[in-house]
């Protein structure tokens, strides 16, 4: 893959495919995020012409555009921006709220808060928000505070050994916002110990004057 830039090449979704038997039907096993696809034939037999036909892609998301609530009383350009933004959110709505379908596909605690707020105003899919909250709580650190990031595959685990102060501080607020939007008290009770642990963890970074210490042990 020829490219420019400094982003890790592991995030570039390129693929080398060998067609051993032709004609035939082939399906690529990975999930991709793209607007355009470039196909380059590197080598083929001299015994005939090579062609691809019937190419299709299957879109996957837990977001349902039939439930999408468009912005009300806005200009046409604002409505268009809102719809594109909702489509971006939909692409990140998989089994949890991913930080992006083309990047490392992690569930990040800070991204989750923004995505949840956007979901409440558009799709109102409380299930994917709830599952995401349970994931960061289920992969909590030893002190009970929520995970900063979570990988689901190949096995669900805490994806970052260090914590971001802002993200940890947001978790109790996210639980409150979820309750206000969904009315799901049982989930709040389940997450309450993690929310309290998040508060305790944040307070360890605050000095006697109420200011956050620079050497607080948090990442970033």
What are these regions (language model features)?
Residues 1-99, 111, 127-130, 143-152, ...:
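Extracellular/oxidizing-compartment recognition motifs
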Residues 27, 71-75, 105, 119-122, ...:
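Hydrophobic alpha-helical scaffolding
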Residues 32, 103-113, 124, 162-170, ...:
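Aromatic- and histidine-enriched alpha-helix N-cap/loop-to-helix transition segments
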Residues 37-42, 110-139, 175-182:
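Alpha-helical support elements that line or immediately flank enzyme active sites
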Residues 114, 135, 194-205:
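Alpha-helical scaffold segments in carbohydrate-active enzymes
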Residues 152-154, 172:
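Low-complexity, intrinsically disordered regulatory segments enriched in Pro/Ser/Thr and acidic residues
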Residues 167-178, 191, 195-199:
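Extended, hydrophobic alpha-helical segments in both membrane/secreted and soluble proteins
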